[in-house]
Curated annotation (Swiss-Prot):
This is RNA polymerase-associated protein RapA. Interacts with the RNAP. Has a higher affinity for the core RNAP than for the holoenzyme. Its ATPase activity is stimulated by binding to RNAP. Residues 490-662 form the Helicase C-terminal domain. It comes from Shigella flexneri. Keywords: Activator, ATP-binding, DNA-binding, Helicase, Hydrolase, Nucleotide-binding, Transcription, Transcription regulation. A motif (DEAH box) lies at residues 280-283. Belongs to the SNF2/RAD54 helicase family. RapA subfamily. PROSITE patterns: HELICASE_ATP_BIND_1, HELICASE_CTER. One of its GO terms (biological process) is regulation of DNA-templated transcription. PANTHER family: DNA ANNEALING HELICASE AND ENDONUCLEASE ZRANB3 FAMILY MEMBER, SWI_SNF-RELATED MATRIX-ASSOCIATED ACTIN-DEPENDENT REGULATOR OF CHROMATIN SUBFAMILY A-LIKE PROTEIN 1. ATP binds at D177, E178, V179, G180, L181, G182, K183, T184. Residues 164-334 form the Helicase ATP-binding domain.
Length: 968
């Protein structure tokens, strides 16, 4: 290798050193100085891992003074190069720049520059880069992008709502599904889609204080969304880091009380430029025209500043038309400004609902009914569709579905309100109650008497709360070490039940963490029963481990002992037996407990066991829940309303459980109230709204499509290849689970999403649902997305060289595989990837410019190739550099046609889809006032910006592979 003082070379193994200069040459060694780092390297002359840097006409080079030059001619004299060309800053031509004065901070970013500079990648990295481009482009085009990555069952009605709302600009909707139908999951799916597509970047979730951790866990575990929980302490800390503390995080959860309590805090929240606001338990926002509550006013103020708003409530509108109106008013105050007018409008929807029922029944329609449908829909060319719907042809059913869809678009609050009911959603189990009446021990009787005397001044509510938990009253007098479990008959019953049902998984819920911990110790020490504990004092990781141990079929825990707060947000539908060691204070909490098992997808009827002590508040409550509300064996949408109306009476009975006079009458009255309200709910069910919210066959097809994608073997192969190349260790643990741990030779020292201790992953949705300690890997998981970013945002795999052993071709035949990327730059919120994601175009050129890519498929070709070490590769590249340059020019001439075709197709698709959506909403605006002006404006603006961005789309060479034919 001939070296001359002043020549510029680059290290093949340490490219980060920049451009080196030969400063010393002797018989056996050569010394290079790398000015950008100030370091020297001594190499053997005969076989040094360095590559001569030589630029060609057409290249742009930078001088050590910072100015740039377009090379037009290269001269060599005594082994040193001089570049002649035109300066780009002054446009002076004929400028000469000797190679010694080249900028030393040279970075080769173009694939061809890296190849010619000897920066040759491993062949498997090139293949990974191409696959990453290909799969990434395909995923963006999927119609349900953003709906596949969550750790949830594929439930059609949830997917339907999320798919509809998640694609809207700044959605403002009310999610009002009945308890247990998954409003939190629907909201999470909508957030996930909006964040993934770039439609939203900053999200604020406001919930009651007791639900903060539930939301935190749900968002992280199900959607891989890492929210920050803001309380007084966190807010005070963040004030040191920013003028507005909420600017320090993109995704924030806080309580309603936290937001409402301080005027300055509320102002900071309003100024923080959120894209989406989510409010859970919105039925607690009390409103009347004369006196809205402070909570309502706080949310109203926020809703005025935040473009997208999701309100969640389980309270049906029939149980309070005024509060229902108040919630809709938060979403669109211009549309919902007059309560009296709103009530009148609601009455007018009855004929529409009847028309939908008529169409769905499938009976022949009379002329009057056809005329009424025509008037309701109000389209000029509706006649053929009406005739088709009333015919006996094969198209009749689809015509009726289309008419139903048109009716739902044009009438009612279906764009702002979604409500599914258990009657409309199939797949729920039965619930069977087993009450076990037990005697009240004398120890408790004594403690309760003394407590009654000492707590005479306590309020009835405090006394009632105390009476629900006699073991705690006993401990107050006997101290924390009091062994109440030695005489409490509920403990004996529980041990007997568990030992006689060893094969069953049993969920035991009690109000307090201390009770759960004490029960675990007793079960373990007395009967050797394996019990996991789950309470609010544990970290999320500890809870995951406990849940995973409970989920294990053979070696797992038989029992999971949960505290009230600790179990929030967790579902264990693989179990069907529940024991309530005590009872919660209100019907909402009771439903929440049962909801841990009573989910869609539960395979067995739920057995609810309630051991209770006679003559205690528990005996009062168990009767009231069961006989007064039927709340154990059926969901109870009337529970909160009745609870509020009889609260004072109920509290008195709970505080003095031995005084039962009039209690039977109270139960009878509550049951009558319950039946009347239930009938009112059933009669007032908005069938139109339920049909729209449910999604029908369309939602079912969506769930099936995603289920098919779950079996994508390309993902597993790609992920394993990705982990190998990044340097992540993989340990197969069986049961479709793999443990990933960082290695000492990773591409990056700290890979996002991979902790030092490692993580457990699975590609199987069912395993992920059963094992909360295993992360569910899909194309949308941060681990895969971070891996794609790592590969595609850098140079990994962008230049390589391979040998093709093929005796049918002459030795030395050259082929160049080019991967171009066609792309457009635009702000993320335009969601340009729907139409033109960065799309790879593969070309396989011979020296005459013939493109063989169509005949030679990538994976088949890749398997026929052999790798070349970097040193040999550099020699090969130097030998054929001129030929490669010529082939590259032929490639540049050919790519334009393919790229233009892709760009034109994207423009046509964008124009067609966005114009159609705009036209549809403009037509509906005439008959349905629930379509907001700002939504129409946003779609028109979005269309214009998308078209402008696509007009400026271009292409670039992303990767290349040089292939040399050999016979050896």
């Amino acid at each position: 290798m001939p070296f001359t003082l002043g020549q510029r070379w680059i290290s093949d193994t340490e490219s980060e050193l920049g451009l080196g200069t030969v400063v010393a040459v002797d018989a056996r060694t050569v010394t290079l100085l790398f000015p950008s780092t100030g370091e020297n390297r001594l190499y053997a002359r005969s076989d040094s891992p360095v590559t001569r840097v030589m630029f060609n006409p057409g290249d742009t080079i930078t001088s050590h003074d910072g100015w740039q030059m377009q090379v037009e001619e290269v001269k060599e004299e005594n082994g040193l190069l001089t570049y002649i060309g035109t300066r780009l800053d002054t446009e002076e031509s004929g400028v000469a720049l000797r190679e010694v004065f080249l900028d030393s901070k040279l970075v080769f970013s173009k694939p061809q520059d890296r190849l010619f500079a000897g920066q040759i990648d491993r062949m498997d990295r090139f293949a990974l880069r191409y696959r990453a481009r290909k799969y990434s482009s395909e995923q963006f085009r999927m119609p349900y992008s953003g709906l596949r990555g969550q750790r949830t069952s594929l439930i059609p009605h949830q997917l339907n709502i999320a798919h509809d709302v998640g694609r809207r600009h700044a959605p403002r909707v009310l999610l009002a599904d009945e308890v247990g139908l998954g409003k939190t999951i629907e909201a999470g799916m909508i957030l996930h889609q909006q964040l993934l597509s770039g439609a939203a970047e900053r999200v604020l979730i406001i919930v009651p204080e007791t639900l903060q951790h539930q939301w935190l866990v749900e968002m992280l575990r199900r959607f891989n969304l890492r929210f920050a929980l803001f309380d007084d302490e966190r807010y005070a800390e963040a004030q040191h880091d920013a003028y507005n503390p909420f600017d320090t995080e993109q995704l924030v959860i806080c309580s309603l009380d936290f937001a409402r309590r301080s005027k300055q805090r509320l102002e900071h929240l309003c100024e923080a430029e959120w894209d989406l606001l989510v409010v859970d338990e919105a039925h607690h926002l009390v409103w009347s025209e004369d006196a809205p509550s402070r909570e309502y006013q706080a949310i109203e103020q926020l809703a005025e500043h935040v473009p997208g708003v999701l309100l969640l409530t389980a309270t049906p509108e029939q149980l309070g038309m005024e509060s229902h109106f108040a919630r809709l008013r938060l979403l669109d105050p211009n549309r919902f400004h007059d309560f009296a007018q709103f009530v009148e409008e609601q009455k007018n929807y009855r004929p529409v609902a009847d028309a939908v029922a008529m169409l769905l029944a499938g009976n022949k329609l009379s002329n009057d009914e056809l005329n009424m449908l025509g008037e309701m829909i109000g389209e000029q060319d509706i006649e053929p569709l009406l005739q088709a719907a009333n015919s006996d042809s094969e198209d009749a059913q689809s015509a009726r579905q289309e008419l139903v869809s048109m009716l739902m678009d044009r009438h009612g609050t279906s764009r702002v309100l979604f409500r599914n009911t258990r009657n409309g959603v199939k797949g729920f189990p039965k619930r069977e109650l087993h009450t076990i009446k037990l005697p009240l021990p004398t120890q408790y009787q004594t403690a309760i008497k003394v407590s009654g005397i000492m707590g005479a001044r306590k309020s009835a509510e405090d006394r009632a709360r105390d009476m629900l938990y006699p073991e705690r009253i006993y401990q107050e007098f006997e101290g924390d070490n009091a062994t109440w479990w030695n005489f409490d008959p509920r403990v004996e019953w529980l041990m007997g039940y568990l030992t006689s049902h060893r094969s069953q998984k049993v969920l035991v819920i009690c109000a307090k963490a201390a009770t759960a911990l004490q029960l675990e110790q007793v079960l373990r020490e007395r009967e050797g029963i394996r019990a996991a504990v789950f309470h609010e004092g544990m970290s999320i990781i500890e809870r995951d481990r406990a849940a995973a141990w409970f989920a294990e079929e053979d070696t797992g825990a038989q029992v999971l002992l949960c505290s009230e707060i600790g179990s929030e947000g967790r579902n264990f539908q693989f179990a069907s037996h529940m024991v309530m060691f005590d009872l919660p204070f209100n019907p909402d909490l009771l439903e929440q407990r049962i909801g841990r098992l009573d989910r869609i997808g539960q395979a067995h009827d739920i057995q609810i066991h309630v051991p209770y002590l006679e003559k205690t508040a528990q005996s009062v409550l168990v009767r009231w829940y069961h006989e007064g509300l039927d709340a154990f064996e059926h969901t109870c949408p009337t529970g909160r309303t009745i609870y509020d109306s009889v609260y004072n009476d109920l509290i008195n009975y709970l505080a003095s459980p031995d005084q039962t006079e009039g209690f039977d009458d109270l139960i009878k009255s509550c049951r009558e109230q319950h039946e009347a309200l239930k009938a009112q709910l059933e009669q007032g069910r908005d069938r139109l709204l339920e049909i729209h919210s449910n999604g029908g066959e369309k939602a079912q097809a969506l769930a099936e499509s995603i289920e098919e994608q779950d079996d994508d073997t390309n993902l597993i192969a790609f992920a394993m290849n990705l982990f190998d190349i990044i340097g992540i260790n993989q340990d197969d643990r069986g049961d479709n689970m793999i443990v990933l741990t960082p290695s000492d030779h990773m591409l990056v020292p700290d890979f996002p999403g991979l902790s030092e201790d490692g993580i457990t992953i699975t590609f199987d949705r069912e395993v992920a649902l059963a094992r909360e300690d295993a992360q569910f890997i899909t194309w949308e998981h941060p681990l895969i997305r971070n891996g794609l970013d790592l590969i595609l945002s850098g140079d990994t795999g962008s230049s390589t060289i391979s040998l093709l052993k093929n005796k049918a071709l002459p030795v030395g035949t050259l082929l160049v595989e080019l991967i171009y990327v066609v792309e457009a730059q635009a702000p993320k919120q335009l969601q340009l990837n729907r139409f033109l994601p960065p799309t790879p175009v593969r070309m396989l050129l011979d020296k005459n410019g013939n493109n063989l890519a169509a005949q030679v498929e990538f994976e088949t070709f890749n398997r026929q190739l052999n790798a070349v070490n970097r040193h040999t590769g550099s020699k090969l590249v130097n030998a054929v550099q001129q030929d490669v340059h010529a082939i590259l020019q032929l490639g540049e001439a050919q790519i334009e046609k393919s790229a233009r075709a892709l760009i034109d197709a994207a423009r046509n698709e964008a124009d067609e889809k966005l114009s159609a959506e705009l036209s549809r909403l403009e037509a509906l605006r005439a008959v349905n006032p629930n379509i907001r002006d700002d939504e129409l404006t946003a779609i028109e603006s979005n269309r214009q910006q998308v078209m402008e961005s696509l007009d400026q789309a271009g292409w670039r060479l992303d990767a290349l592979r040089l292939i040399v034919v050999t016979h050896q």
